Amino acid sequence: GNELGFPKGDHSDFSCLSQEMIDYCIQDVAVTEAVHKQLVKNMAQFLPECIELEHKVQWIVQQQEINGWVLDQKLANELCATFKEGMNDIQSELQEMFPPIVEERHSEKTKKRLKDKVTVFNVGSRQQVAERLETKGAVWSELTPSGKPVVDEKTLKQNSHVPEAAKVLEYLLLQKRHAQVLSWLEAVKEDGRVHGRVISNGAVTGRMTHQSPNMAQVPAGHSPYGKECRSCWTVPVGKKLVGFDASGLELRMLAHYMDDKEFTNVLLTEDIHTRNQMAAGLETRPQAKTFIYAFLYGAGD
């Protein structure tokens, strides 16, 4: 509303009819009308077929959101407990690897000995993790603007030859999986389903975005604990859950615009990502996928 010259205002008391409420309602309608006119104006730059396609996709996505996904709450709770137990076990192991640091304390005035300061290792403290792992030979390749080591999945993997770093990495993975499954359980409605939101054209690239919770981030089956996490999603008795994946949509669109017979033939008869890997001299197929999609979506522009 502010961008279109119609400040929406604010009104919170709807206990009884008032002039302020009426004014708020009128302004709300004016804002909605202004937004509609602006959208109609913006739509003029798109082909009618594009607009129709977006609306058809949104209808399907909305139906998906309404239907929701059945979550096996018993299995999800058991999985949460397993992850939590694993985190506690690793925490205990790390506290044995890194004994408490004891610092003597003395009174500044009397110089009398005070109770020692005891710092028990906390795997949740990135600063403690960095300091303790450095004593075991870890080297940090990235630093924060303030000069402190960046402790994350990437830098821990670089130090995975250090047993203690590998333990911390496993802890963070379990912590992440626990948070994911817990978010599903917290989102379950009375019908036993999770109704995650999908914005069909939410990203600047035109791709979909997901929230409350992000259903697109359910771990892949080949990733650590991915199979267990995916097993939490099910269907009512008597139904079957069918999975499928579209193959190379962006590359098929690229083939359309390139109109190159050789590229199209490779796309349809071979593994295009392996071919790109060889052509670009990359080490792995996933690197080739990252490269081509980064290029197509404008990385480096």
Residue ranges, per PLM feature:
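Short, amphipathic alpha-helical "recognition" segments used to contact nucleic acids or chromatin
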Residues: 63, 287-298
